[in-house]
Amino acid sequence: MGRDDWWRNASWNEEIEAVFFNKLARARNKTWYLRNQARALASSCPEVALRLLDQYFTLGGDLEQAGAHFYRARAHVALRNVDAAVLAFEAVLAREDAVPNFRTWAFHELPVLIAIERMSARYDRAIQVLVKHKDWLTFPVQLYQWHGALALILHEQGQTLEAENEAKQALEAAKMTHSGFQHHPNLGLVGDTADEFGNRLRQIASKPRSGLRWWRK
């Protein structure tokens, strides 16, 4: 890590922490560095990310509080703190409503979490969030998660035909090999789909329709 990259460590230990806080003590915009270091650690070192974000909010945050709430949500997801993750995602959406210039991916990551965890009491809320933010869809991975979350929820609600259609659209997005951006062709592509989310989508997309009957002699 170079001298100018002290705020985006991908790992964490006592030595890295000492350097980080030494640099932070001399930095002017401390909240910016805390937020961005938490971003880098949200999945790999979620406990550290949460601690940094606590300091960020203690200092009053900044205009990009939506991002801070978002990284907090991702850290809780990594720790399997599902209820805390939902609350953090909701804080993101509330902040985005208040300050719409700063957007995150909470509008599809929250519904994905709700769908994966089969949080049936929150299905209507998940669909509301998806529909409200459909115009925000940009990257293949967003299309994959948006249609995929809707597919899983509709399937749980017994709307099998609609779920099948959404699942197929999600899987088509997973096949995309270009982001649509000339200078960033690989940005926002779908990675590995061999997880619970992807497996459930494939099951929904390929499930035989019970209404069809074939005549055999």
Predicted segments, located by residue:
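N-terminal alpha-helical interaction modules that lie
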Residues: 1-86, 91-97, 136, 160, ...
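Alpha-helical scaffold segments of alpha-solenoid architecture
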Residues: 104-119, 164, 170, 174
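Extended, charged alpha-helical interaction scaffolds
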Residues: 112-116, 124-149
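Short coil/turn linking the two alpha-helices of tandem helical-hairpin repeats
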Residues: 100, 115-120, 138, 158, ...
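TPR repeat positional signature
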Residues: 34, 69, 107-110, 147
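Residue at a conserved register position within TPR or TPR-like alpha-solenoid repeats
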Residues: 41, 76, 114-117, 154
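Residue signature of alpha-solenoid helical repeat architecture, marking inter-repeat boundaries
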Residues: 28, 63, 101-106, 139-143
